[in-house]
Amino acid sequence: MNMKVENKIMPNEEQINGFLENSEIGPISMVNLLKFKEKACYEDKRDTDLTGEEAYRLYAVEVINFIEKYGGEFIFGGKVSRLMLGEVEDLWDAVAIAKYPNRKAMLDMTMDPEYQKIHVHRDAGLEGQLNIETI
């Protein structure tokens, strides 16, 4: 069996629409498989010496407050050390798991204007990710 794996920064329209359906389903846990850029690259072209991981870390330390503000909790975060089973062309750098009361809580968090301010560090640091919803 071959599985196509494609890291992305943002969900596509079909994924967004699916997430909006049954927004009260929950609790949900989001498993994030993260791949960082070698060097952070900000959309506003600011000069930086940060690695992608360092830029993402600026986002990560702040996003925990937003997860909690919307009734969720940060469950786990860690660096990937190796692949135990299976094969992928390029291994992810880190894994993070966050739990939300429901889809709506996560969506509300992402729409928060204060959250949007820290999102620039996420985008600057991430080469791509897989974000897997579990119920």
Question: Can you say where each PLM-predicted feature lies in the sequence?
Answer:
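Short, Lys/Arg-rich amphipathic alpha-helical interaction segments
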Residues: 97-135
